[in-house]
């Protein structure tokens, strides 16, 4: 499927129907009083979070969403029908920003939970018929109130994947191999950097409780300067902003005995520069590909980690060694941590990119 995480659209609510100018005309009542009905209210534009959608691709194809106008009032005090609301489904995790005339943006909706509905543009109010304007001094008003126009809003949509755990690290750290081992996701895997070019999602199931599951996001490899957009880092980092915790994977090939944990520190510095709240997110640190070193050298790294006061898991995702301990720790953190992390909406918003990406999202079948 086509994965798009940003789009610009317009939402236009319905206009209110005009009030009616009418007078009662019946047999033997040639000069009845005013009986013009009210116009109907315009329809609202409503955004609804849906688990059916995983991308904003549809909003690149259709960019204008308009609700129905209210119908005008009629004689005999008949009110016009209200316009139907337009309900637009959005992927769960979509942020809706309103764009002002000066280019400034403000967050108006956060569709972070399934089935949440938010009225984005309110329909115009219907006008009153001339029966409302009758008085002792004006018994035959020949005017009515026009309906109010609807709202028109220019919106930018931004999708942030809602995952429980986010995998991150330097390129070629083995994140895709890890997610393929612990979930049903089947990302592209090869022995060269930047194999993963778009986020992959996997779902890890509890073997003892089928209803217990964990959504994992495999984020493409990050490089130095990612917070400034190097290697499209700013496009990828936003997808881990809402995770409960991070699984930080470092390849043993990137471990230097003089400063073995420099790879962890580099990525953590990028997280801190991108968003301070993300930089302080709980994380599990993992050294992968221990099958490439003799066991005694791996034991030396374990001792070094303990001496440095770091809790680091040593694994071989390819051979499955050490995965059980990491998975157990992930389940523990899932139970203890909340996903509702603060949103830093003050960070400068990047302009909408023109490129699109392909991504395969695989879910476990029950």
Curated annotation (Swiss-Prot):
Subcellular location: Cytoplasm
Record keyword Nucleotide-binding present: yes
Listed InterPro entries: G_OBG, GTP-bd, GTP-bd_Obg/CgtA, GTP1-OBG_CS, GTP1_OBG_dom, GTP1_OBG_dom_sf, OBG_GTPase, P-loop_NTPase
Alphabetic keyword roster: Cytoplasm, GTP-binding, Hydrolase, Magnesium, Metal-binding, Nucleotide-binding
Span list, region Disordered: 125-150
Residue stretches in coiled coil: none
Main location: cytoplasm
Stretches assigned to the Obg domain: 1-162
General function of this protein: An essential GTPase which binds GTP, GDP and possibly (p)ppGpp with moderate affinity, with high nucleotide exchange rates and a fairly low GTP hydrolysis rate. Plays a role in control of the cell cycle, stress response, ribosome biogenesis and in those bacteria that undergo differentiation, in morphogenesis control.
Family as reported in the entry's similarity comment: Belongs to the TRAFAC class OBG-HflX-like GTPase superfamily. OBG GTPase family.
Protein name, entry field: GTPase Obg
Name of the coding gene: obg
């Amino acid at each position: 499927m086509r994965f798009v995480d940003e789009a610009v659209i317009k939402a236009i609510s319905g206009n209110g129907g005009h009030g009616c100018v009418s007078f009662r005309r019946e047999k033997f009542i040639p000069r009845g009083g005013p009986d013009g009905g009210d116009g109907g209210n315009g329809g609202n534009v409503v955004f609804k979070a849906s688990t059916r959608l995983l991308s904003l691709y549809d909003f690149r194809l259709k960019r204008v969403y308009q609700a129905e106008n209210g119908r005008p009032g009629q004689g005999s005090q008949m009110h016009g029908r209200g316009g139907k609301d337009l309900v637009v489904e959005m992927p769960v995790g979509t942020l809706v920003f309103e764009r002002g005339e000066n280019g400034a943006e403000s967050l108006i909706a956060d569709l972070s939970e399934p089935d949440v509905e938010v009225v984005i543009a309110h329909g115009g109010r219907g006008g009153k018929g001339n029966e409302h304007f009758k008085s002792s001094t004006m018994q035959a008003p020949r005017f009515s109130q026009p309906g109010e126009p609807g709202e028109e809003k220019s919106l930018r949509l931004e999708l942030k994947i809602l995952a429980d755990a986010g995998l991150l690290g330097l390129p070629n750290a083995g994140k895709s191999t890890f997610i393929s081992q612990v979930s049903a996701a089947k990302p592209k895997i090869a022995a060269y950097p930047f194999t993963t070019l778009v986020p992959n999602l996997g779902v890890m199931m509890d073997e003892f409780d089928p209803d217990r599951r964990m959504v994992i996001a495999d984020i493409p490899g990050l490089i130095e300067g990612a917070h400034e957009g190097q290697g499209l880092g700013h496009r990828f980092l936003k997808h881990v902003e809402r995770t409960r915790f991070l699984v930080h994977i470092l390849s043993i090939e990137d471990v230097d005995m003089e400063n073995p944990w420099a790879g962890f520190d580099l990525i953590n510095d990028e997280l801190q520069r991108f968003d301070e709240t993300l930089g302080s997110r709980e994380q599990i640190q993992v050294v992968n590909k221990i099958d490439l070193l003799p066991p005694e050298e791996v034991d030396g790294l374990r001792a070094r980690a303990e001496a440095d006061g770091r809790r680091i898991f040593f694994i071989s995702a390819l051979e499955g060694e050490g995965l059980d301990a990491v998975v157990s720790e992930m389940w523990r953190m899932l139970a203890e941590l909340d996903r509702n992390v603060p949103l830093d909406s003050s960070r400068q918003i990047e302009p909408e990119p023109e490129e699109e990406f392909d991504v395969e999202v695989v879910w476990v079948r029950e």
